[in-house]
């Protein structure tokens, strides 16, 4: 049985987008974007731990895209390495979820917000995390 709230993580080599569900698992909302500095994912995991504690997170949803091209294999390998570091730190169940096209959907959504392109770019990763988290919530209710 899935426990709520869920923290969704949209992994990236430069940014990690975060989103969270409510305590009933009905609604996803974007949180923040963590900047990855010098490939230091342990620092990001420390930040994620703080968010987990503050929000009483019970489950992690880690976005993993489907592999369509050989070039994407390296991305998946990096996500798997990040997942190992994350698992050591958070000690919560981690569910892998296909987040393919979540960034494209998030870009479309943000176009209608009338924000500057710079502001949209700052939010894109957390909105993408919210997109695939909401898809997950909808499929599990």
Which residue ranges define each predicted feature?
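Phosphate- and other anionic-substrate recognition elements at nucleic-acid/protein interfaces
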Residues: 2-7, 14-141
């Amino acid at each position: 049985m899935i426990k709520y709230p869920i923290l969704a993580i949209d992994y990236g080599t430069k940014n990690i987008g975060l989103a969270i569900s409510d305590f009933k698992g009905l609604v996803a909302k974007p949180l923040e974007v963590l900047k990855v500095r010098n490939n230091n994912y342990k620092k990001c995991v420390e930040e994620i731990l703080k968010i987990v504690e503050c929000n009483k997170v019970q489950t992690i949803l880690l976005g993993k895209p489907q592999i369509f091209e050989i070039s994407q294999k390296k991305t998946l390998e990096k996500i798997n390495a990040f997942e190992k570091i994350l698992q050591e730190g958070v000690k919560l169940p981690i569910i892998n979820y296909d987040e393919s096209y979540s960034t494209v959907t998030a870009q479309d959504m943000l176009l209608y917000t009338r924000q500057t392109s710079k502001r949209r770019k700052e939010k894109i990763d957390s909105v993408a995390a919210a997109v695939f988290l909401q898809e997950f919530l909808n499929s599990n209710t």
